[in-house]
Amino acid sequence: MIKKILVAVDGSENSFRALRFALDLAEKYAASVLIVNILQFPVIYTNPNDQLVYSGSRDAFIKDLQRIHEETLAKAADEARRLKPSVEVAAELKEGEPAAQIVETAKRGGFDVIVVGHRGLGRLSEVFLGGVSERVAHLAKCAVVIVK
């Protein structure tokens, strides 16, 4: 039986399709939904002169990045509550490598299903880079739905 659904959003249209799918599933099974957005801090490389490539301060960059992720999460939560007011919805911002954080959140929270969007990388990119959805499907111990 499905009681707890974890859905990851990144602001892309595919992730919002995944959100809508998760909400439909939650409504059908009277399940709750946790929406997560994963903030992965990028490596800021330095050049040989030891100057940051990013022209602003590192703190300002991180603050902007965090704000963008918080806005994405708030938009997803608002959309979920608007579309399915009867579904219990919570939202959390996590930090780290996306696939690992999604899987760990599902494990710790005892989630029955993880729903993620398909990124839609080209075939060659998928071979070399893989994707978050593929890594989640590989690592997760619960059911994973990848929405196209």
Per-segment meaning from a language model:
Residues 36, 90-94, 145:
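General small-molecule cofactor/ligand-binding pocket signal
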Residues 19, 51-52, 68-73, 98, ...:
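Conserved N-terminal glycine/acidic-rich loop preference
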Residues 113-135:
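Glycine-rich, Arg-bearing micro-motifs that act as flexible, cationic patches
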Residues 3-56, 84, 88:
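Small/aliphatic-rich secondary-structure junction motif
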Residues 55-71:
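A short acidic, glycine-rich active-site loop
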